[in-house]
């Protein structure tokens, strides 16, 4: 891959016109063959691996040669081996070809994406989900409305191929991509659809398609929003704080006026802020309702004309931050007013004015999470703890570790909320559910179990809370610990319960608009 990158940088003609010969390089199929075996061996038992899982480069070349002679390249997935025994081998050959196709297409895409990211000095990527919230805390309180825009996964295969043609002029190299997409569209599960739905599976090929599709949408959207923004700038990263005056000068523009020696100093304050996690981009807008309606209309028209795709209205929802809450990343996001008392003393009298500032207030959805716990049989629908009968066959240590891990993950993920009282209600449910599960296993009572285990119940969680409360916020850490929020930098993915609740919220919105 490094060799491909170096060649691509040295000769732009190569990356445009010489991708197709890479399909006939045996080294490429050896790499894809080894990668597929590594992935498949980790996901299936060792007894399913046999010596028949060998790759014939001659067969692969013959398959690629037949691609041009087929309408939809059914030969890619059917009759790819003369042996009638090999349904599994048919899948093996098709996956090997997909791996090779992905490797070839990743070469120019990695070069484009790297060059585009280098041109965006403000764009930053972090591994933790909680890195999004400091950006929201800085930008959301100064915005009026937000647009909750979902990236559509439904797109015609030919439109997807034409987006590649904008960057790759080597038309033969896109024939395998077109054949794979049409073959997937003609599969039994998609016979009733006129468009291809990019599946949410963890194969390298479809993940690459998803990443390219999102990158194509955002690269065009950024340039359009920059042109339409009032200040000619788009915020999609964390700017320096305005309290640092020596950095502040970098973000100031000077406009010279004619017939005057004075200059107008204007701060480059972006009016549009963009942040995305997964398929949920959020656009915060500071302006009148007319500007919000124009942005929403623009997003719908952009998808319709650029991707020839009719986007459902519910996929671009607008919310006023002062009135409504928006659900994202397992939180209810809202902006609340925070009054500040400022004492101003003069020689004659004392003034105590009240300053009102806006502050982002993420709320933990306690009731929906309890409903999800009821679905998983930790409690009933009213929130009363019950025993987890499916775990009674485990050992006591495994039961304790599982309940403890659920609570630690929840407490760790929702540590950014001011109001954590509801979390202790969830802890109470898990604690009694754990005790009832152990009592059901040993055919005893909760009192006996708590007497025998004592502090062993949620021992790790208690230590985690003590560590959380003892963080050095200031000299008055004990008093401020309940009023401070902490965004952690070690959370690579959304909490499972929060993710389940977020999907339920999305389905509710879709059903509301379908009615």
Swiss-Prot record:
Superkingdom, natural source: Eukaryota
Compartment(s): Plastid, Chloroplast
Protein task: Usually encoded in the trnK tRNA gene intron. Probably assists in splicing its own and other chloroplast group II introns.
HAMAP family associated with the record: MatK (MF_01390)
Molecular function as annotated in GO: RNA binding
Keywords: Chloroplast, mRNA processing, Plastid, RNA-binding, tRNA processing
Stated family: Belongs to the intron maturase 2 family. MatK subfamily.
Pfam families tied to this protein: Intron_maturas2, MatK_N
A GO-annotated cellular component: chloroplast
Name recorded for this polypeptide: Maturase K
A single BP term in Gene Ontology: mRNA processing
């Amino acid at each position: 891959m490094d060799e491909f990158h170096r060649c691509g940088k040295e000769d732009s003609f190569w990356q445009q016109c010489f991708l197709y010969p890479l399909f006939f390089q045996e080294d490429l199929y050896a790499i894809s063959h080894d990668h597929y075996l590594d992935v498949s061996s980790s996901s299936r038992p060792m007894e399913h691996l046999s010596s028949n899982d060998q790759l014939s480069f001659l067969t692969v070349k013959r398959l690629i040669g037949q691609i041009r002679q087929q309408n939809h390249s059914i030969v890619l997935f059917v009759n790819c081996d003369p042996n009638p025994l090999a349904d599994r081998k048919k899948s093996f050959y098709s996956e090997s070809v997909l791996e090779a196709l992905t490797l070839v297409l990743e070469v120019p895409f990695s070069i484009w994406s790297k060059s585009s990211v280098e041109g965006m000095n403000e764009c930053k990527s972090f591994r933790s989900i909680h890195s999004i919230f400091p950006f929201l805390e800085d930008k959301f309180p100064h915005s009026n409305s937000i647009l909750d825009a979902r990236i559509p996964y439904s797109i015609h295969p030919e439109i997807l191929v034409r987006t590649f043609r904008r960057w790759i002029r080597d038309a033969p190299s896109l024939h395998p991509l077109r054949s794979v997409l049409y073959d997937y569209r003609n599969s039994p599960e998609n016979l009733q659809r006129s468009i291809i739905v990019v599946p949410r599976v963890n194969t390298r090929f479809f993940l690459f398609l998803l990443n390219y599709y999102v990158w194509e949408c955002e690269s065009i959207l950024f340039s359009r929003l920059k042109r339409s923004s009032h200040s000619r700038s788009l915020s999609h990263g964390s700017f320096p704080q305005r309290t640092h005056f020596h950095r502040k000068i970098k973000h100031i523009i000077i406009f010279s006026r004619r017939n005057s020696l004075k200059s107008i100093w204007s701060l480059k304050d972006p009016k549009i802020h963009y942040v995305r996690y997964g398929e949920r981009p959020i656009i915060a807008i500071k302006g009148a309702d007319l500007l919000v309606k124009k942005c929403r209309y623009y997003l719908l028209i952009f998808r319709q004309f650029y991707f020839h795709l009719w986007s459902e209205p519910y996929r671009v929802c607008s919310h006023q931050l002062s009135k409504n809450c928006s659900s994202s990343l397992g939180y209810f996001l809202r902006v609340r007013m925070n009054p500040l008392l400022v004492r101003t003393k003069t020689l004659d009298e004392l003034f105590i004015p009240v300053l009102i500032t806006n502050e982002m207030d993420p709320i933990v959805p306690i009731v929906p999470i309890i409903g999800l716990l009821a679905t998983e049989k930790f409690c009933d629908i009213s929130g009363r703890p019950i025993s987890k009968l499916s775990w009674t066959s485990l050992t006591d240590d495994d039961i304790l570790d599982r309940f403890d891990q659920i609570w630690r993950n929840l407490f760790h993920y929702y540590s950014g909320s001011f109001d954590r009282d509801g979390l202790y209600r969830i802890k109470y449910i898990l604690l009694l559910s754990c005790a009832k599960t152990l009592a059901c296993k040993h055919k005893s009572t909760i009192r006996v179990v708590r007497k025998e285990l004592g502090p062993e119940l949620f021992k790790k969680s208690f230590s985690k809370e003590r560590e959380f409360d003892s963080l050095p916020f200031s000299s008055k850490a004990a008093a401020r610990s309940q009023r401070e929020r902490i965004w952690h930098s070690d959370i690579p993915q959304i909490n499972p319960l929060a993710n389940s609740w977020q999907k339920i919220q999305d389905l509710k919105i879709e059903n509301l608009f379908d009615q």
